[in-house]
Amino acid sequence: TAALRLRRGGARVTLVTKGVGGLQLGQGTVDVLGYTPGRVEKPYEAVKELASKHPEHPYAKIGVEAVREGIDFLREVTGDSYLLGDGETTINLPTAVGAIRPTALVPPSMIKGNLKDGDKVIVIGLAQYKDFHAGLIAQNIDRATLPGGGHASARAVVVDFEPREGEYDATGLSIARSLDNARTRRALAEGLKGFVNPGEIVALPAVLGIDNHSEVLADFTKILGAEVFEIASLPPCVPGMRLNNKLVVTAKNERVDYVLGSKVTGCKVTDGKVVSVTVGTVGAAKEIKADAVVLAGGGFESGALKLDSHGHLHETILDLPVTMPEGVKEEDLVHGDYWGSPQPLFQCGVEVDENMLVTYQGKPVHSNVYAAGGVIAGATRWQEKSGEGVALGSAIKAADAILSSVGAGAATRERN
């Protein structure tokens, strides 16, 4: 998001990433704020309230308008064929275990999973796809009280489907690739038709194509004569791959320089400003000059933040100072009540100002280093369901601040 925002603003952009990123591990949905700790029904309103009550939270610096702008920008980039929703109202979807989780934007293939009282669902599993447990999902949907009140009923059916002859332990991606083939998907849909009762909504694992997804969804809907939705399974998740592929292709088409599989190993600082970063490429290290840097490496899960064996915290890419929750010592970052109160460790990260410029104790660390996403301190993203909202809002603020200060200069976004 930061790279595309900068590129469309006229900057020359290099995107450096050690790996393919976490999007394809996700469900292809976009969270803004799901819990505070109670379930949220109006995400933007909840962001405002959270920001006013918790000044240490990233949303207090980002602000709801930047989050809204980030959501709108992402939808502009991807279009309605990838994401539906407006962030104003929560969309509630069944998970891979049948629990109902809140989110803000969803792929069109999932929107019918926003169940209401009285809905009847048939969950169809594929015997060769062992990461999708249709019976468990149906049982939990059947007994759940829906967020809007009432209940849906659900039952499960499991059928045989070999994406390739003799493939008895298939992945979601191999099934999705096989369903990109029109003959294969139509044969499967015809075979499922007899299981579906009139009025039932059909829930399938999120494997309805990777490159020809819209056509796959349309064929299943037409042949089954029913509303169809995907339920995300265990990562890596096909809807996340679709969204990741769309953004990468868009960035390349818009002439963002994309450096994949290379780690940033250091930077050169002159007069308090990072003037270049060093990237470990095959053969020799490469120096990339930069007028501004956006650090978007994620948190502990991606390796951008690290707690070493001595209990010391590190930011591993640019060696920026890491802040902890107020009043917490390093030895208390992880407590023994694992199923109780939040672990302070996950609120650690880099400190930023309202422009997402990285600071420490209120002063800029470098005059041109900004942060976006999970590396920013103050949010327990997985528990709040705030990850994408924080990432999008901070990316918008960082990119716009850079464009205001350096205009069409080169900006390097780094991920580790």
Segment roles from a protein language model:
Residues F132-A144, L179-P198, V202, L208-C267:
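Helical element adjacent to the flavin cofactor pocket in flavoenzyme catalytic cores
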Residues V32-L115, D119-L126, I137-N140:
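Dinucleotide-binding Rossmann-like beta1-alpha1 core, especially the glycine-rich loop
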Residues L4, G303-H314, H366-S367, I376-G409:
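A conserved FAD-binding loop/helix module that cradles the flavin
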Residues V13-V16, V264, E287-G298:
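Short hydrophobic core segments
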Residues K18-P55, P163-R177:
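Conserved N-terminal glycine-rich FAD pyrophosphate-binding loop of Rossmann-like flavoproteins
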Residues T1-L15:
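N-terminal Rossmann-like FAD-binding beta1-loop-alpha1 element of flavoenzymes
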Residues V248, C267-E287, V293:
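Conserved beta-strand-loop-beta-strand element in the redox core of flavoprotein oxidoreductases
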Residues V248, A284-A285, V322-V328, H335-R381:
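FAD-binding beta-loop-beta segment adjacent to the flavin cofactor pocket
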